[in-house]
């Protein structure tokens, strides 16, 4: 599943004031993986430095793995119950797996939630354009 256009995601997240505030001082690599693809987001000093398609299973600070259907539900413009929040719903009820530096994820959870909100908005815009 195509999670997001890397170029548009990089530009949109870096232009988002809420993300910039929540992510200040954050240094991490996120690997967002489905069975067919992975999206690698590298964050340096609170800004997305690079965003690109990648092979799954590469080392990252935080790795989130889900089925294609799970990602589609999670990134829907209005996610149904228990798909609105990564840890509160998806991990407990829908088989998402989160691995890596959980303390970093916890400290910057609002930034990661904002990243996913931007991904939802981009996905909705691309679906409307199709």
Q: What do these predicted ranges mean?
A:
Residues 1-130:
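Feature captures hydrophobic
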């Amino acid at each position: 599943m195509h999670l997001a256009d890397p170029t548009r995601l990089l530009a949109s997240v870096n232009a988002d004031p809420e993300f910039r505030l929540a992510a200040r001082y954050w240094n991490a690599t996120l690997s967002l993986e489905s069975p067919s693809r992975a999206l690698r987001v590298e964050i340096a000093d609170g800004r997305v430095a690079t965003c690109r398609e990648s092979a799954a299973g590469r080392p990252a600070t935080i790795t989130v793995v889900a089925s294609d259907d799970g990602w589609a539900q999670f990134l829907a413009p209005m996610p149904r119950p228990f798909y609105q929040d990564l840890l509160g719903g998806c991990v407990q009820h829908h088989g998402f797996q989160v691995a890596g530096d959980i303390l970093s994820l916890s400290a910057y959870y609002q930034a990661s939630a904002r990243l996913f909100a931007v991904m939802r908005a981009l996905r909705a815009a691309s679906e409307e354009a199709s």
